[in-house]
C-alpha cells in the first residue's frame, strides 16, 4: 500500500468516526466537523465548477499568448494557469488543458497550484475582507516572506513526486520571475499590489459565476451559451469527491488540534509568538480563514509568521488534500511535503522579516522620544 493510499484510508476512518458521532448527537465534536466537510460542497461549487467548465475555452483563448512566452523560457505553459489560479479554483483543470506533457500538468496543477495560485486568487482578497486596515502591513510582509519560499516548496514537492530535476528547474524559471516581481511590488508598493490582487480575485469570481451559469443552462435546457465548454457534471463530480475527503480531513484536524494542543503551543512560544498566534498556525493547516479572524489578537511577530506560513501551508489538511485526493491521488504525499516545506521555510523568512520590522519600529519610537524630550 502506497503512502497516498494510507492517507486516503486515514481520511475514510475519520469520516466514519465523524459520521458515527453525528448519529449519536455530536458528543465528541467530530459530528460537526463531518457535517462541515460535506457542507463545503456549496462554496466549492461556486469557486470551482464554473472555471472547470470554462477550462477548455480559456485554454483555447490563452494558448496563442501563453504557449510562445513559456516555451521561450523553456517552461511548460501549464505553469501559467496555477501561477494565477488555485488548484481547486480551476487552476488544475486549466493546467491540464495547457500542459504539453502530463508531468508538467501534474507539477503545475497539484504542486504549484496549491501554493502560488491560492495566494493571489484567494488568500490576499479574503484576508483583506477580514483583517483590520492597520494589519495590512503585516499581511504584505507575511505574503512577501511566503512567496520567497514557494520555489523551494515546489522543488521538494516535485522531487518527492519523482519528476525529473531538469523538468522541475526549467518550469521554476517563470515562477521565480513572477515571484520576484510580486516581491518587488510588495516591497515598494504594498497597498497598490494588494489592491490589484483584490481586483483580480473579484474578476475570477465573475468568470467562475458566468461559467457555472452557462454550464447549468446547457445541462438543464440543452442550449449552448458558450461553445466548447466542458459538461458541468465533471466539475460537480470533482466537488463531490472533495467534500467526501473533507468530511474525514476536518475530523482529523480537529483531533490533531485537541491531542497535540500543548506541544503546538510550546512550539509557538519557541518561535516567540503569543498563544493566539500559535493556535492560528494550527488552524491554517485546515483553512486560513479562522487564522485571519484571529489575526487582530496576535502579537506583531505572530502576525507576520502566520501569514508567511499560510502562503504555502494553508489548506494542506483541508481543501487541497480533498481536491488532490479527488483528481490525482498519486500527488497527495508530494503536495503535502511541498506545502509543508514551503510553509516551514517561510516561517524562517518571516522571523527574519519580523525582527527587521520590530527593530525599525523600535528605532522610530526612540527617535520620537528623543525629539519630544
From Swiss-Prot:
<keyword id="KW-1003">Cell membrane</keyword>
<feature type="transmembrane region" description="Helical">
    <location>
        <begin position="307"/>
        <end position="327"/>
    </location>
</feature>
<comment type="function">
    <text>Probably involved in the diffusion of protonated ethanolamine (EA) into the cell at low pH. At low pH most EA is protonated, and this permease becomes necessary. Contributes to bacterial survival and replication in acidic macrophage vacuoles, but not to bacterial uptake by macrophages.</text>
</comment>
<feature type="transmembrane region" description="Helical">
    <location>
        <begin position="166"/>
        <end position="186"/>
    </location>
</feature>
<protein>
    <recommendedName>
        <fullName>Probable ethanolamine permease EutH</fullName>
    </recommendedName>
</protein>
<keyword id="KW-0812">Transmembrane</keyword>
<keyword id="KW-0843">Virulence</keyword>
<feature type="transmembrane region" description="Helical">
    <location>
        <begin position="61"/>
        <end position="81"/>
    </location>
</feature>
<feature type="transmembrane region" description="Helical">
    <location>
        <begin position="111"/>
        <end position="131"/>
    </location>
</feature>
<dbReference type="InterPro" id="IPR007441">
    <property type="entry name" value="EutH"/>
</dbReference>
<feature type="transmembrane region" description="Helical">
    <location>
        <begin position="331"/>
        <end position="351"/>
    </location>
</feature>
<keyword id="KW-0472">Membrane</keyword>
<keyword id="KW-0813">Transport</keyword>
<feature type="transmembrane region" description="Helical">
    <location>
        <begin position="197"/>
        <end position="217"/>
    </location>
</feature>
<dbReference type="GO" id="GO:0005886">
    <property type="term" value="C:plasma membrane"/>
</dbReference>
<keyword id="KW-1133">Transmembrane helix</keyword>
<dbReference type="GO" id="GO:0034228">
    <property type="term" value="F:ethanolamine transmembrane transporter activity"/>
</dbReference>
<feature type="transmembrane region" description="Helical">
    <location>
        <begin position="38"/>
        <end position="58"/>
    </location>
</feature>
<comment type="similarity">
    <text>Belongs to the EutH family.</text>
</comment>
<feature type="transmembrane region" description="Helical">
    <location>
        <begin position="236"/>
        <end position="256"/>
    </location>
</feature>
<dbReference type="Pfam" id="PF04346">
    <property type="entry name" value="EutH"/>
</dbReference>
<feature type="transmembrane region" description="Helical">
    <location>
        <begin position="5"/>
        <end position="25"/>
    </location>
</feature>
<feature type="transmembrane region" description="Helical">
    <location>
        <begin position="143"/>
        <end position="163"/>
    </location>
</feature>
